[in-house]
Regions:
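Conserved SAM/SAH-binding beta-strand->alpha-helix loop
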Residues: 124-126
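A short acidic, Gly/Pro-enriched loop at the edge of an enzyme's catalytic core
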Residues: 148-159
């Protein structure tokens, strides 16, 4: 009998694949193991590391994921969550993967609203640790992995979530069933426009990402999701900490007290190969 935090992995035989030899992984005691004797221990928090030799980007440290968790829990991305929920309710996927999931907000929220097997990964072990600790329902299969080679079996997924993250269309095509869908959110032109104005930057231009997606896949549905929120000082500080737009910016060079509202804008696509 497995403890509750590890029970979720009892239904994953041969869905996970070995990152070293690509053979299917099966649960053996408290590890996932392949027939070539590669073993990956299940952490007591409820995740498995399938990228033991990989290093996460220095720009995505524990503090940035904690800040992101605060911003998401404050509701600033709830309209994007609602759009995802709308499409997932329509599709009813039996299996879903959240790529580059960060601290796991979308997977946790969506899994609590709809049935299905939810998988979620990030290259950052810190983020997956946060995600698994926050998963009170203990249902999402959290794992550390690399987007370049996702350790899941061919045609094992009904849907993939890609929210504000890079895409690997070759891997997505391999993983999705023939009728499977990609749900991809890209920033809208007004995304974080208030921060861009303070920095003296022009509005975001999403055309290149939009064009590349349409070259790779057929668009089945498209939602425009934009909302503006009032910021508390605490959420403003967390937003400034988590935003990739500010990674190369000296925050002390600007007066951020003037940032009292923020616009979160995205285009959400449902697409198929």
């Amino acid at each position: 009998m497995y403890p509750p935090k590890l029970q979720r992995f009892t239904t994953t035989d041969l869905v996970f694949t070995c990152p070293f030899c690509q053979e299917g992984l099966q649960l053996q005691e408290r590890s996932l193991a392949c027939r070539n004797r590669h073993n990956f221990d299940l952490a007591k928090q409820g995740y498995v590391n399938l990228a033991p030799n990989a290093k996460a980007s220095q720009h995505y440290q524990k503090e940035s994921f904690q800040a992101r968790q605060m911003v998401l829990e404050a509701g600033l991305y709830d309209h994007i969550l609602a759009g995802l929920d709308q499409i997932i309710t329509k599709l009813q996927p039996a299996s879903l993967l959240d790529v580059a999931c960060g601290e796991g907000f979308y997977s946790r929220q969506l899994e609590s609203r709809s049935a299905g097997n939810y998988y979620a990964f990030d290259l950052s072990k810190d983020s997956i640790l946060l995600a698994s600790k926050a998963d009170s329902r203990q249902q999402v299969k959290w794992f550390v992995a690399d987007l370049a080679k996702i350790p899941l079996a061919d045609q094992s997924l009904d849907a993939i979530l890609d929210i504000f993250s890079p895409a690997n269309y070759q891997e997505f095509k391999r993983l999705l069933k023939p009728t499977g869908s990609l749900l991809k959110a890209i920033p809208g032109s007004q995304h974080l426009i208030e921060i861009r104005k303070i920095l003296g930057k022009e509005a975001y231009q999403p055309e290149d990402i939009d064009l590349h997606l349409k070259e790779q896949m057929q668009i089945q549905d498209q939602l425009e999701l934009t909302a503006t929120y009032t910021l508390t000082p605490e959420v403003r500080e967390a937003l400034l900490t988590m935003t990739p737009l500010l990674q190369q910016v000296r925050l002390e060079d600007f007066d951020w007290t003037q940032l009292t509202d923020i616009t979160i804008s995205a285009t959400l696509y449902q697409a198929q190969f």
